[in-house]
Each structure stands twice: as C-alpha cells, then as structure tokens.
Amino acid sequence: MRTLGTCLVTLAGLLLTAAGETFSGGCLFDEPYSTCGYSQADEDDFNWEQVNTLTKPTSDPWMPSGSFMLVNTSGKPEGQRAHLLLPQLKENDTHCIDFHYFVSSKSNAAPGLLNVYVKVNNGPLGNPIWNISGDPTRTWHRAELAISTFWPNFYQVIFEVVTSGHQGYLAIDEVKVLGHPCTRTPHFLRIQNVEVNAGQFATFQCSAIGRTVAGDRLWLQGIDVRDAPLKEIKVTSSRRFIASFNVVNTTKRDAGKYRCMICTEGGVGISNYAELVVKEPPVPIAPPQLASVGATYLWIQLNANSINGDGPIVAREVEYCTASGSWNDRQPVDSTSYKIGHLDPDTEYEISVLLTRPGEGGTGSPGPALRTRTKCADPMRGPRKLEVVEVKSRQITIRWEPFGYNVTRCHSYNLTVHYGYQVGGQEQVREEVSWDTDNSHPQHTITNLSPYTNVSVKLILMNPEGRKESQELTVQTDEDLPGAVPTESIQGSAFEEKIFLQWREPTQTYGVITLYEITYKAVSSFDPEIDLSNQSGRVSKLGNETHFLFFGLYPGTTYSFTIRASTAKGFGPPATNQFTTKISAPSMPAYEFETPLNQTDNTVTVMLKPAQSRGAPVSVYQIVVEEERPRRTKKTTEILKCYPVPIHFQNASILNSQYYFAAEFPADSLQAAQPFTIGDNKTYNGYWNTPLLPHKSYRIYYQAASRANGETKIDCVRVATKGAVTPKPVPEPEKQTDHTVKIAGVIAGILLFVIIFLGVVLVMKKRKLAKKRKETMSSTRQEMTVMVNSMDKSYAEQGTNCDEAFSFMGTHNLNGRSVSSPSSFTMKTNTLSTSVPNSYYPDETHTMASDTSSLAQPHTYKKREAADVPYQTGQLHPAIRVADLLQHITQMKCAEGYGFKEEYESFFEGQSAPWDSAKKDENRMKNRYGNIIAYDHSRVRLQMLEGDNNSDYINGNYIDGYHRPNHYIATQGPMQETIYDFWRMVWHENTASIIMVTNLVEVGRVKCCKYWPDDTEIYKDIKVTLIDTELLAEYVIRTFAVEKRGIHEIREIRQFHFTGWPDHGVPYHATGLLGFVRQVKSKSPPNAGPLVVHCSAGAGRTGCFIVIDIMLDMAEREGVVDIYNCVRELRSRRVNMVQTEEQYVFIHDAILEACLCGDTSIPASQVRSLYYDMNKLDPQTNSSQIKEEFRTLNMVTPTLRVEDCSIALLPRNHEKNRCMDILPPDRCLPFLITIDGESSNYINAALMDSYKQPSAFIVTQHPLPNTVKDFWRLVLDYHCTSVVMLNDVDPAQLCPQYWPENGVHRHGPIQVEFVSADLEEDIISRIFRIYNASRPQDGHRMVQQFQFLGWPMYRDTPVSKRSFLKLIRQVDKWQEEYNGGEGRTVVHCLNGGGRSGTFCAISIVCEMLRHQRTVDVFHAVKTLRNNKPNMVDLLDQYKFCYEVALEYLNSG
C-alpha cells in the first residue's frame, strides 16, 4: 500500500466534473446511497455515513460541506475497517470512473488510509489498486480509474477506510462512470495468456492507449504470486505504447493471474487478468529397467510412462557413461527399449532417460540413473611360464608371467595357488589366493610345508564367468631340523636329592630322531651358602629313550633342564623347564646326654647350638616345653617328636595342649652356641617363657625350621628333661623354732626393701604391663580367629625397631636429587650410610631452631592455666633437626611415657580468644559449625555493603606463613548463604589460589556448597567463568576468570581441589598430598594475596595443609622443623586448628616422607643430562645416585602387615593366591560383583591410580586354572576395556590360556567371544566381546587384550624400549578411542608384581610428560607401592622407567 501511495500525487485543482456521457454505477449522494446500488459489508467494524450539510448543517470546521459519504475516525481505534461497495459493472466499452475524496484531521495526523480495490468476477480481493495516506489537506481532490476488463468479465469497485487512531474525516463524493477514456490515465488493451516451460522467462506484452511520462510507474501485478517489474516501454505512436514485463526463472509457484498496472499523476489504469501457465519439463519417475546384460552390452526398458512434469512427450533420449569416467554419450530412442552395445566387460555404467515436451527448454533433466555392471568375460587364457624360484625345507617360491585386464577380462578375479602333498599317507590339498598379480615380477611363496615332501603346484585364474589353469609342477621340499620337545611334556618328579625327568619326542620330527641332549644346571637355591658352581652337566640319550634319573642333587635347589632332539641335519631348538628339589629339614646338633647346664625348681638352662641348613636357611629356632602326663605311651611320644603348630602358653590350657612354645628366635640371633634358660619369665618373639612348675615333669625340645617355596621342614632334638620336685618333710615344731627366730629378722628387712622398691617399679611399669597384656590378648585373638581388622600404620610401624636408637640422613634434599657431604650417619637397623644435605643448613646459627622462631611467639589472646598446659614455651618443645626427625617420630610412637598422645593433649582445646562478631545473631547463619568460628583479632574483614553493618563478617582468619605475615586465610567451606561473601573475600584480598581439602559430600553429609560454576555464573557484582579443568588422580585444578562490575580487570584464579582425603581419618599415605602441596607452590604467583585454604569447618584438614606447607619451607631454609609450636601458633589465630591426634601424627609422617624423598621431578629438557649423571659411579662409595634413589624408595616403601591382608588370608581364599607373600591389601581390593554360584567375591588384584584417573589400573596375577572365571568377572564388573599381559602362557607354572582363539568361552554367566586378532612386532592384540548372559539388558563390552612378547621370562626388563613404549601407546589409543579414556586397564604378569608395576609406572610417567612436561619416576613408583610394595621391585626395572621416558622424548 505504501508503494501505491508514493506513486500517487495529490490531484489538486480537479474540482470540475468531466464532461461527457455517464454510465450507471455513479452516485452524487444527494439521495440515499442505496438508490445508487451502493452497499456496505456486513463484517465491517463500522459503517460509512451519508452526510448532507445542506439539510443538516454542522458547525464542525473540519467537516466538508455538501452531500457525500463520510467516515468519522474519532473514537475509533487503529486498524478498524469499513467498506463501501459499488454495484458490479459490466462495461465493455471504454469508460472511466471518476470520484472525489476529502481528508481532514484535527491533529494534522492522517486519520486513516483510503484504499480502492477492483474485484473481478467475484474473485479474490487482491491488493489495492489505489490509496491515499498522506497528510490531511481539508480540500476535495479528484482521481480517476481506467479499468479495462472486457467482456464477458465484470468487476466491482470497493472503497475501504482503515483507521489510524487519530481524529479526522475521510469522505468521497461524486462517483461517476464516464463513457469516455480517462483524460490523465492510459487505458490498457486486452492482454493474452502466456504459457512457458519451467525455468524460462514469461513475457507479458501490455498495449495501452494514452500517454506515459517520466514518473509514471508500471508493473505487472499478480494474485498470490510475485509482482514483476517493467522490462521496457516501446512507444508506437503519440497516444500508444507497449509495456513489456518478464517473470524470470519461472516455476510452478509462479503460475497464476497477472494484470498490467500503471500509476500516473491523475489516477490508476489496470488491465484485464491474463493467465500464466508454467509447464514442467517431463522427467521419468523411475530409472530404466535392465532387461538383459552381457559382457559387452546392456539391454534396457526406458520405463518412462510415469513422469514428473507435463506432457506431451515429443522426444526420448538415452544417456549413459561409465560410473568412474568423465565422458558420457546420448542416443535418441524411438521405441520403449534400447540395446547399448560395444561396452567393456566387468565395467559399471550409469544409464538415464531424458524426455522432451514442446517449447523452448522442454527437455527435462535426466531421470533416475540405472547403475549396473556388465558381466565378466571368460579369461583369455591361464597363467604362463610357471617356474620354481626357490626351494627350502618348509617353503617353496614360484613365479609366473605377469598379466592384466586384457587376460582376466574381469576386475574381480582370484589367482589361486593349488598345491597338494602327502602327510601320514593321506593326500592334503590346499589352496592359497595370491594378491601379488600386479607386481612386475609376480611370485608367491608357499609356506608351512613339511620337510622332505613332494608338492604338486598349479595356478588357477578364476573370475565369475570361468577359469583357466596353468601347467602343473612337482617339487620336493628340503630336509630340516626337528622341532622342539614339547615343553609341557617335560615333567619332573622332584625329591630332596634327585629328580626323575621324562619327556616326549618332538611333534614334528622331520626325519629320524637319532639323539637327545639334556643340559642341566643349578640356577638358584633357597640356601645362599650352597656353592652351585659344580651343579651342571650334559647327558646324551639315544633317540628311543625319553627319561633319565638325575641324582646327587642339592636339596632346595632349582635346576634348569634343556632338551634338544637331533636328526641327521642337526639339533633342533631347545626346550627348557625348571624343577626344584624339595628342601630338607635342618640337621640338628647332637645332644648325647640330656644334661642341663643348670636347673632350679622353676628353670632349666641348656646350651643351644646352631643347626646346619640343608637346602634352605634355618628360618627360626624354637624352644618347646612338653609336660609329661600319665598314660602317655612311647609311640605317642615319637609321633609328637616335632611340633609344627605353635601354641602360646596362654592358649595351651584352653586347647588342652600337652606342649607350648616357650621361645622363638630368628636364625641370625644364634650364630654360635649360647646358653638359654627355660622358665626365665621373659617373652621371646611373642612367646612367654613362663616359669616351670616344680610339681610337674617336663621334656624340653629344641627345634629348627626351614621355610621356602611353600614348604616347611622341621627337625628337633630333646635337650633336657626336668622331673617333678618331691616335697620336703615338715620338721617338728620344737625343732623349728630357733631356725625361724633366726631368719625372721632377715626376712623382715628384705620385705621392707622389696615393698618400697615394688611401689616405685609398679608405677613405672604400669603402662608397660598393660601394653604387654594387650599384646598377649591380641596374639590370642590371632590364633583363635580367621580375619583381623585393618589398622592404620606409619613409618615406625612399618620398618623401625622401637628398642633401638638410630638416626638417618636422607639421600634426597627437599629441592631435588642427592647431594654429597663428607659427614655421614649410620642407621643401625640396616647399616645404611647416607650423606647430610648441606642445603638444610644455610647458616650455622640456624642449625638448631629455638623459641626465637616467629611460629613460637606467644599471642596476646592465649588464656591458659599452667595446670592444664604443662608446656607453654618453645624451650620444652624445641625445633627438631631434619636429620633427627625419623628417630624423634619413632620414639614418640613407641614411647611408653610421653608420646604423640600426650603431646597433642597439651594443646589448648576450644576458645582461646574473643569471637564477639561471630556470635552476633546477624552472623550466626554465616557459620557452618557453632564451635568453629572466627576470632575477632585475626578475622578477615570484608568491605562493608551499603545498608548492612554486619556485612564485613566472614568465617575466616588470617594465618602467618613462614616469614610471610597473613600468608594464608583459613576459612570454612562456603555455604549457600556465604558464596557471594566468599568471592568478595577472594577479590578483596587479591587471592590467586584457593585450596580446597574436602569433597562436597562425605558419608552422605554436605561438607561444602559448590561455589564455582561449570561455565559462567554471576554472583551479584562478581562474574566467575570456568576456563580450564585439569583432572588428576588425587586432585583437580580449576582455572577461573573473575571480573567485578565497574572494574576493568580480569583476574585468573586457580582452585586446587584435593579429592584424595578419605571420608574418615587421614590419607593412608602422604604421597598424594605432598604432590598436591608442590603443585600449589609451583603454580601460585609469588606476589598475589593470601592463599585461601578451606575444608568443611576450616580447622582440621585446613590446619594440616598449612602446617605441612610451612614446615616444608622451614626444613628447606633452616634444616629443622617445629611442628608443635607451629600448631600452637595456628591455634592462637583460629580455634582447634589440626583437630585430631591422628592428623597431628599424619603431619609428622608427611614431613618425614617429604624429607626422605624430596622433590624428585625432572623437567623434560633436563632428563637426558640428569639421568646420565645419576648413573655415574662414585669411586668413594662404589655407588651411584640412581642406586641411592632406589634404596631410598625401598626404605620408604611400607611393609604390609598380616591384618592389612586379612581377606586374602582367609582359608577359603588361599587357593586363589599364586604366592602367599604377594597379597593385595584389603583397602584396594576390587570385590567381584557378578554372582557365580557359591564362589566368593575375592580375587588377588589391587586397584591402582594412574596420573590423571583414580583406580585406572587393576594389577593382578596371571589367572590360575581355578580363577579364570573370576578374572573375567573382574573385567566385566569393573568396566575394563584393556587387558595387558606381560608373561607367557605356561601350564607348568599354572599359567593357562584364559581366552578363546575362536568361538565363545563360557565362565559361569560370563561369556567371552573372540572377535579378531592381530600381530604387530612384539604385540599380539586380540579383541573380545564379553557380556553377562544372565543380564542381557546390560549389553556387551568390547575388550582388547595386548599380549607383549618382548619380555622373556629370563630377563628382568623388556628387550626393547621402543616396543614397550609402543605397547603403552597402543593401550592408550584403544582406551581413548573405545571408551573416551574412562575404562580401566587390567595389567597382569606372573604374580602381579615387578612387571605389572613397571608397565603402570611407565604409563604414569608418559602421562606426566604429556601434561606437565616433567618426569618423576620416584613419585610414580612410590604411589604404586603405597598399595602394593612389590611394584617395580628391581633396580633394572626402575632404570628402565627412566630409559623409556627418554625414548618417549626422542620419539617426539
């Protein structure tokens, strides 16, 4: 409408009625408008009004005068409509409609829009042909309509008013239908219908009578289709012109009715409607059909009866081309079928049909293509010139003349090598397909043949249409060596001093076996004192003998037997197996006369002599006391000569045992003969040597036991006999009086002294006796129960002796690798001599710390009573030298008087300073716990918010660091109500590091609210955006971008979230937390604000972190630590920092581990040079740094106690353990979930962390025959996607093949299905599909097994670093591709020890290099050993980890 409005101009001045003849349809509105045949629409919002001011004057100056049709827009909302309909006109002669209109407004704003429509033949209304919407003029104007519809069409003119919401008037008057042409507007002649094919231009020619001037607008108007612009105007005379319009790129949507329009200064001219018909070129709906096919032709049916588009069809064509070619050919077709000839055999073609209708552009696009292939043709001939190139014992190589497509006449063909030979009197026929046909010198090698065999060979060229054969050749394979004797057939029956060896002849003899050669050699013995140098030899046996008895061997010795078979060509490969002779019982010394050295009523003293070992060292000596009872026969005595089952004296009566163990000694404590007293009332290795009872008779036995390889052999000898003491007769009273009087005085004096002495001793020994009673009760429980509870342990419990005083010096300083110094200290327990790191002591005046340390200064707010806190100054708790730390911790843990418990209890508990702000009612809701709140003197004060006088409070306190005031803020874990305050504090304090030492939820309780976003979050005026997350096994590092409204600054803040703290207690080991502390130190900017540290309450774990961080700095700078005074200082700043004794002890253990181990990480750029230096041998110590590092690792590796492995030691689980000395601890067991009958949920396996993922590895032993089903339950239950196998299948060592080579193996409900296998260098990879048949809804899992062949059993390390690194990378790639790195990896070797640990350690080191560009082999192995002490158990394996890291760096 706006376009039409702009094309119209005001027709000012045309106030006179045009002269000439008029037709019906006009109206002057002097009479009612209905008399003129005018009407109004029923659906209008309001009606036009007929006004006559002559008969009904008005005083409204805005209303025109006269008689007219009026719309008063006052009070009418915007958008309301009213229509005035003229009568239908059927004027075929030239005529003109003339009318006047009036527009006025009281606000100078248009009162509405006046439109004129022309509706033809009661058709759609269409768009307005004329409108006026300009500013009101308050004068009458004239307009004319030149309408050309032509007979038999009729039309109707409609006036429409659309209100604008403004007050005013719109009126029309003097509507006339004149019988002559319009004076200012051209008339169109009749326009004709147009038909085109889709995609072509449709041109409409509109001839008009009249003049056109510049400024007139012409266009082609359609109904429900697009308008077309003017193409050109051609003036044919002074009063005639032709206007052309193009509808471009026609489609079916353009078909419809169009009319010509011209807008002039005086009015509008319109033509009749013409139809645009758009025809769609025909396209077949279906592809042509294949009637028949040959090698060189295709016969098709056009199949073009059904089409898309319009007919009629005037022509047909077939277009075809090769599917891979760029050319095509088009052939006209005059029938419904067509044969395409002269085609190539076995070639794919695409064939389409094209149809044409009349008119330009009438040819449609090609129809759907038929894609088909010609048949192959019979090969021209068979292969020629077949000849033998090379003959070997197991293979022959043949060659033939090359050929190509012109011979095969087919792209799909097989060249098959057909050969036959006899095996065992039976004809064997084989076929192999050769794919080397395109080689310029084609040849094929037939392998896996038997030696000395005639083989007939021919080639067969085959395609789907036929086959051609070559001539046949016959050739004989060469002679060969025999195969190996089957390893599983080498069986040995072992005795103490002989082995009976049996074997079978090789499965593949390849001739007559003439000889067997057996080489034997002693490789190891359980007894290190045995000389094995003479225990070797070689034996030859004739080919028909397959057994031999070896005698004169040593007990307890492992012998290696290697057998080779020989034919006339020589010896075949060896087969080796090992067998171990049984150990013998120790040889006890002779005791010809059972005469004791001394004897009292309660004791017997005998001389104990060392026993002679036989095959295994003596493990232990034991003293057994047997009570002589009535009715014991000699036979029974002989049967019970030796005593394999130890029984404590306390349990002997409970068990009704006739004997008990009085003492037990380690073998090294009895190197020479020495006396021993039975009944001395002391305890030896847990056995109470109780005094003998005088009225009983005893036999004293001395026995020695040797233990090795699961065997225990005992020998014993009776060393003494004690008879019962006969009671002396009682003397007569009168003879006794003098004697009694004489001794009474002596006895009274002695008794007085004893009473005083006992009073003192009882007080001193009270706790010691209590401890002994506890140990005795514990020992009894261990004998009477199967399972014991797991207990936490520390370094002192793991490897120290509380009765010995010693000191240590670590081979690693706090900053890095080992250093050397002339001074050294000796550890008595293992004679380890190491050096003092000079960097501990930068200044001689600081070698010993005192209460001058800032950490030890008293605080103003401390309120203590002397009676409650006996130690108030640093003088009673001086700093401890790092060199003395191990001794100090050992003494504190083993102390019978003042130990960690007493030291921790000396700390002031509870409030020690005012906390009035925290106690305000307005601040109570800001505290997570009512008893852990902020002291006033050290609390963090936030900037006050407007209108809130308490908005400066947050539950957090400043804590001083090492020579850095207010270096930390200890705070609680944010609550939902305090998240905004928390970020306010972080921003205000310019904090760059947040340390979080809790999980959000622990044991079902919320410990901290999640105060950070996963993407972006706005906390009032602070915007926090997560930009990076680094997930590691025991902690997460998140990086945020933080902005504050109104401040043009973006700060980067890191959150260090330690996730490895258990729900109860403290971490089992400090290794992970120490690595976490080092990360915080390395990534915290030195000039930033305080470190914000929080757990849940902000006291216990928070205190642990801060104390450890401060003490590491102190140890590095001063060579001392002052843990006690540091904790005391922290508690003066915030209540109850370090909340439990357990945490206090853990801090000591963590600092000790840090001092022992140091920071062993190496930047990637320095690995090569440092590793070279680490391997240099020190001529003075004859050792190297890497050896010392490995020794340190062994020293700090915890030893598993019996109670740690209680589940593995249950009797029902014994048969599931390959080695009883390599057991998984209870805390890292993966309990089996899948139910399998009565089977237990135990498997000998342990969960291990990788660098980035907790419990990423499961380390286990090679499945035993009875645990294969448990192994697959483990794989399924723990979502394992990779299995790494680092040992060989060896049934002799109970290492069966546990997987299927094809088909499906069923292990209870678990089904393992073989999918595929591949061999690449030293790695066999097999893919299996496993699923639980009892739970089909769970679906299946794909598991890839990687069997590594490059680690022979006789080597401590793999043969190749490159191939082992390739194994690591293949496992990583499969893990990432199959399960996004989320699945676990099962790693197993023979016993789940050194080899498995080496794989896990190297995998961790490679992850370190990828993500941190550092190498820390020590930390990687230490982390693994925290769960299993036998991980990476050899120095060579430890070195190999470094060497693979170098290989990783070299490979890029």
From Swiss-Prot:
According to its UniProt record, which residues of this chain constitute the active site?
Answer: C1095 (phosphocysteine intermediate), C1389 (phosphocysteine intermediate)
Pfam families tied to this protein: fn3, Fn3_PTPRU, ig, MAM, Y_phosphatase
Q: Which Gene3D superfamilies match?
A: 2.60.120.200, Immunoglobulins, Protein tyrosine phosphatase superfamily
Named from the GO MF annotations, one term is:
transmembrane receptor protein tyrosine phosphatase activity
Where does the record say carbohydrate is attached? N72, N92, N131, N249, N406, N414, N454, N534, N544, N598, N651, N681
GO-annotated biological processes: homophilic cell adhesion via plasma membrane adhesion molecules; negative regulation of angiogenesis; negative regulation of endothelial cell migration; negative regulation of endothelial cell proliferation; neuron projection development; response to xenobiotic stimulus; retina layer formation; retinal ganglion cell axon guidance
Q: Which InterPro entries match?
A: ConA-like_dom_sf (IPR013320), FN3_dom (IPR003961), FN3_sf (IPR036116), Ig-like_dom (IPR007110), Ig-like_dom_sf (IPR036179), Ig-like_fold (IPR013783), Ig_sub (IPR003599), Immunoglobulin_dom (IPR013151)
Give the Phosphoserine positions (modified residues): S821
The UniProt record lists the keyword Calcium: no
Mode of membrane association = Single-pass type I membrane protein
Instruction: Give a brief account of the tissues where this protein occurs.
Output: Most abundant in lung, less in brain and heart.
Disulfide linkages recorded for this protein, renumbered to the chain, are C27-C36, C96-C182, C206-C260
Q: Which UniProt keywords apply?
A: Cell adhesion, Cell membrane, Disulfide bond, Glycoprotein, Hydrolase, Immunoglobulin domain, Membrane, Phosphoprotein, Protein phosphatase, Receptor, Repeat, Signal, Transmembrane, Transmembrane helix
Where are the membrane-spanning stretches?
743-764
Q: Where does substrate bind?
A: D1063, C1095, S1096, A1097, G1098, A1099, G1100, R1101, Q1139
Signal peptide region:
1-20
Q: Which PROSITE patterns does the entry link to?
A: FN3 (PS50853), IG_LIKE (PS50835), MAM_1 (PS00740), MAM_2 (PS50060), TYR_PHOSPHATASE_1 (PS00383), TYR_PHOSPHATASE_2 (PS50056), TYR_PHOSPHATASE_PTP (PS50055)
Location in or out of the cell: Cell membrane
The function of this protein is: Receptor protein-tyrosine phosphatase that mediates homotypic cell-cell interactions and plays a role in adipogenic differentiation via modulation of p120 catenin/CTNND1 phosphorylation. Promotes CTNND1 dephosphorylation and prevents its cytoplasmic localization where it inhibits SLC2A4 membrane trafficking. In turn, SLC2A4 is directed to the plasma membrane and performs its glucose transporter function.
What's the protein name? Receptor-type tyrosine-protein phosphatase mu
| Organism of provenance | Mus musculus
